[in-house]
Amino acid sequence: MSDVPPRRRKPAWLKVKAPAPRQYRATGALLDELELHTVCREARCPNKGECYSSGTATFLILGDTCTRGCRFCAVETGGAAGLCALDSDEPRRVAEAARRLALRHVVITSVTRDDLPDGGAAQFAAAVAAVRERLPGATVEVLIPDLGGDDAALAAVLAARPDVLNHNLETVVRLYAEVRPQAQYHRSLQVLRRAAAWARGAAPARPPAPGPARPAPPTPARPLVKSGLMVGLGETADEVAAVLADCAAAAVDLVTIGQYLQPERGCLPVARYVAPEEFREYE
């Protein structure tokens, strides 16, 4: 007999509508044509049908294989042999997809690439610049990995002037070892703290790595700093409140809280489904 626990039945408030077939197929075909990855597909996101049906997607750059193995995520994990080389044309294709989808808000994220010296920061910056050129009226949000905690890499992303700099804490401190075994809560919090300080025009707290200086420039409209976490993994309300307090102390502008949904059997099971009333309390 299998020792994998059965999946919990989803409550009524989590049921979603069937996707609109024509727009769903059109979005998927465009992404295939441009050879782009999306979180919707690679991470088996439960909102894929809704997003594709409305002609939107979250672009996933730097390949479809991650150097880490977070236990909530269905993205493929692999070592150096399974990682793709950087694709210099990828930023252009992301921008072209955004233009053809007529997106008003473009979200760009990535797998974690611990093998790259800058963690992929330059590719993020190039993607932001490409979207700015092809779709100047759109806002751009980057959802970045922790970049190994490297200040110069973070500064390079901020120098591209995204409208939103997002880095997800994902879960509470106590659950990090189980949920994100290769990440560190306080390193991620420091990414948010530095991003918020630099977005407000403060100088970097310490010099970046040797090489050309890449400080985050002051901008007329500073980027919003954002984070997110999942609930339903076994955390308590007090632990969630502690994360929110940490974000407030780090001057984070926005925090999203969402229900964790198990994307596939190899991932962590849902500990419980959080009722809508509890989400209202977090607000």
Where does each model-flagged region fall?
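Short connector loops/turns at beta-strand edges and beta->alpha or beta->beta junctions
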Residues: 64-67, 103, 170-172, 260-262
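Core AdoMet radical
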Residues: 74-93, 98-196, 226, 230, ...
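Low-complexity, compositionally biased segments
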Residues: 67, 149, 154, 166-173, ...
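Short polybasic linear motifs
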Residues: 201, 209, 215, 219
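Canonical Radical SAM [4Fe-4S] cluster-binding loop centered on the CxxxCxxC motif
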Residues: 7-14, 50-90
